[in-house]
């Protein structure tokens, strides 16, 4: 199996693994990661969330619409840019965060089982180089 395909396979397996646990919370992988980022930032502009998630803007819009319908987030217009919106967690969204964080940590621990700290560091360095090599190539 070539390296690019292997990276894609691991990514898909990780998402599938997480989705198994997130299903009990009524969330998808994308929704959970969006909630995690919003929690970490406390208040984030939708454009910044798009950049952090690194997925299609329309996919982010769908994720946010679903989270809003579930009353996990609220969106308000930015004073400095009426075209943009601030996104914050509701109390319900904040209550879910510890469970999401636990699932993310559990997934990382499962993925990295049997891989020592030096190997993890090497892998991180290689993946960051690969990411840097591709940044801006499609713009």
Report the location of each language-model feature:
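Residue-level detection of the helix-turn-helix DNA-binding "recognition helix"
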Residues: 19, 23, 39, 54, ...
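Short alpha-helical "packing" element that flanks the helix-turn-helix/winged-helix DNA-binding module
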Residues: 34-35
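Charged, amphipathic alpha-helical coiled-coil/dimerization segments
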Residues: 15, 47, 65-128
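The alpha-helix within a helix-turn-helix
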Residues: 50
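Short capping segments at the starts of secondary-structure elements
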Residues: 41-45
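Helix-turn-helix DNA-binding motif, specifically the short coil turn and the N-cap/start of the second
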Residues: 56-59
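N-terminal leader segment of winged-helix/HTH proteins
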Residues: 1-25, 72
């Amino acid at each position: 199996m070539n390296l690019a395909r292997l990276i894609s396979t691991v990514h898909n397996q990780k998402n599938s693994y997480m989705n198994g646990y997130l299903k009990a919370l009524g969330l998808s992988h994308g929704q959970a990661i969006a909630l995690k980022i919003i929690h970490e930032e406390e208040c984030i502009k939708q454009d910044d969330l798009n950049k952090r998630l690194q997925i299609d803007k329309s996919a982010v819009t769908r994720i946010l619409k679903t989270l809003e319908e579930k009353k996990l987030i609220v969106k308000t217009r930015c004073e400095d840019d009426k075209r943009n919106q601030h996104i914050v967690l509701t109390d319900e969204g904040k209550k879910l965060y510890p469970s999401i964080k636990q699932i993310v940590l559990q997934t990382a621990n499962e993925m990295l089982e049997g891989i020592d700290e030096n190997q993890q560091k090497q892998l991180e360095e290689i993946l960051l180089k690969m990411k840097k090599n591709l940044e801006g190539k499609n713009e």
